[in-house]
Swiss-Prot record:
GO MF terms, alphabetically ordered: nucleic acid binding
Family matches, as CDD domains: PoNe_Nuclease
NCBIfam families with a match to the protein in the record: PRK12497.1-3 (NF009150), YraN family protein (TIGR00252)
Short name of any one Pfam family annotated for the protein: UPF0102
Name this protein carries in UniProt: UPF0102 protein BHWA1_02005
Species the sequence originates in: Brachyspira hyodysenteriae (strain ATCC 49526 / WA1)
InterPro entries in UniProt: Restrct_endonuc-II-like, tRNA_endonuc-like_dom_sf, UPF0102_YraN-like
Family, as annotated: Belongs to the UPF0102 family.
Xref: SUPFAM superfamilies: Restriction endonuclease-like (SSF52980)
Annotated HAMAP family: UPF0102 (MF_00048)
Length: 121
């Protein structure tokens, strides 16, 4: 389990650096919803928009490509946890929000990073 956490943190570090270069600002990392028991990897802003980011990091030999691991169930959990985040932080449901994903496929020879700005389209 510790190895999975280390790998997850590495993926989040890579994603955070990538998004900051694109002009995003970190608000919170690893928000855990008590009610939903979900987790949001990165909560960021760009302008006035709060962006909830799911990070998927896959190394060579692991279970398929990163993009294949964002299921409808995961999207639903992300949305519900974002609602919980807004409530916990006292923010309005009128707050502009979006949901993105950073997909990282890492091999010994190459690292591919993709950013999906809206995973619900």
């Amino acid at each position: 389990m510790a190895n999975k956490k280390i790998i997850g943190n590495l993926g989040e570090d890579i994603a955070l650096e990538y998004l900051e270069k694109l002009g995003y600002t970190l608000i919170e990392r690893n928000f855990k919803g008590k009610k939903t028991r979900g987790e949001i990897d990165l909560v960021m802003t760009k302008g006035v928009v709060i962006v909830f980011i799911e990070v998927k990091y896959r190394r060579q030999g692991s279970f398929g490509y990163a993009a294949c691991s964002i299921s409808d169930r995961k999207k639903k959990k992300l949305y519900e946890t974002a609602e919980e985040y807004l409530i916990e932080k006292g923010l309005s449901f009128n707050q502009k929000c979006s949901f993105g994903a950073v997909l990282i496929d890492d091999t010994h020879y190459n690292r591919e990073i993709s950013f999906i700005e809206d995973i619900f389209i």
